[in-house]
UniProtKB/Swiss-Prot annotation:
It is a peripheral membrane protein. It comes from Cricetulus griseus. This is Choline-phosphate cytidylyltransferase A. The gene is PCYT1A. Catalyzes the key rate-limiting step in the CDP-choline pathway for phosphatidylcholine biosynthesis. It catalyses: phosphocholine + CTP + H(+) = CDP-choline + diphosphate.
Length: 367
């Protein structure tokens, strides 16, 4: 095999080794997908007092270097994380996820403090201890739950549960007369720091509820809870009911306003359409009117043509200028029929008037 072919084989081997189970490689810039795994997710994590431990075998704690390098499958690194876990939220889950992923082979053990210890050292809780135990049990990152965990970890407790490391955020936790309850754990080299999730905590959730207390009280009253169950006084109960009615009226008014705005908008759009249509029709009407009655309209041409025909029909045709003119003979004198007698002789004045009238009639006929 020559050098070129061997280089190709080696490059294929490197790409195959670098590829993920689904075929994606880092060179391609495609993040590899995580394979689906349902092992250990069908049942909640067991309690520590329900697990049988063989104390006859000696337990040797692993070092940080050995834990980071990886341990055999039968010897996982036992990491302990404790807390109150009241109103279990995503911040708790993320902290336990970090504890689970501290080392390649990790067995997380989570301790939950009882109500008595919590009420004495920290304050009242929303959920009781059984509810908090159950919430932690159903977290996918937990392999074992310790009930009634101690507030301060003792060497006896660490040896009893064979704990290798303790996981918690690095912020000093002052309580029980100590500036930091994890100080001796840090000095022993058993502390594995995790990161706190910002923006979410049990105190933040309680603060939100207290801040909007009236809203949640009214909400639960609507859902059937009594004022006694909510620890609400008679006056506040009536106040909440009145506020609810006022809010309903406001909502109706707002709906009416929105509908009226929509109606006005539709009317405006319709009016704009009508105005545009009216303008188009008016232009058509004006154009048709001008075509009929304008200065050069059809009606004027019709009137001119009709006038010309009427004048042609009324006036006689003129004779040609070259033809000789015919003189008419004077019209005979008018006489009454059946009159055999001649009229008496007229006076000279009457004769002259008769001649003048006769001349006028003859001139009119010539014209």
């Amino acid at each position: 095999m020559d050098a070129q072919s061997s280089a190709k084989v080696n490059s294929r081997k490197r790409r195959k080794e670098a590829s993920s189970p689904n075929g994606a490689t880092e060179e391609d810039g495609i993040p590899s997908k995580v394979q689906h795994c349902s092992v250990g997710l069908r049942q909640p994590a067991p309690f520590s007092d329900e697990i049988e431990v063989d104390f006859s075998k000696p337990y040797v704690r692993v070092t940080m270097e050995e834990a980071c390098r990886g341990t055999p499958c039968e010897r996982p690194v036992r990491v302990y994380a404790d807390g109150i876990f009241d109103l279990f939220h995503s911040g708790h889950a993320r902290a336990l996820m970090q504890a689970k992923n501290l080392f390649p082979n990790t067995y997380p053990i989570v301790g939950v403090c009882s109500d008595e210890l919590t009420h004495n050292f920290k304050g009242f809780t929303v959920m009781n201890e059984n509810e908090r135990y159950d919430a932690v049990q159903h977290c996918r990152y937990v392999d074992e739950v310790v009930r009634n965990a101690p507030w301060t970890l003792t060497p006896e407790f660490l040896a009893e549960h064979r704990i290798d490391f303790v996981a918690h955020d690095d912020i000093p936790y002052s309580s029980a007369g100590s500036d930091d309850v994890y100080k001796h754990i840090k000095e022993a080299g058993m502390f594995a720091p995790t990161q706190r999730t910002e923006g979410i905590s049990t105190s933040d959730i309680i603060t939100r509820i207290v801040r909007d207390y009236d809203v949640y009280a009214r909400r639960n009253l609507q859902r059937g809870y009594t004022a006694k169950e909510l620890n609400v006084s008679f006056i506040n109960e009536k106040k909440y009911h009145l506020q609810e009615r006022v809010d309903k009226v406001k909502k109706k008014v707002k709906d009416v306003e929105e509908k009226s705005k929509e109606f006005v908008q539709k009317v405006e759009e319709r009016s704009i359409d009508l105005i545009q249509t009216w303008e188009e029709k008016s232009r058509e009407f004006i154009g048709s009117f001008l075509e009929m009655f304008g200065p050069e309209g059809a009606l004027k041409h019709m009137l001119k043509e009709g006038k010309g025909r009427m004048l042609q029909a009324i006036s006689p045709r003129q004779s040609p200028s070259s033809s000789p003119t015919h003189e008419r003979s004077p019209s005979p004198s008018f006489r009454w029929p059946f009159s055999g007698k001649t009229s008496p002789s007229s006076s000279p004045a009457s004769l002259s008037r008769h001649k003048a009238v006769t001349c006028d009639i003859s001139e009119d006929e010539e014209d």
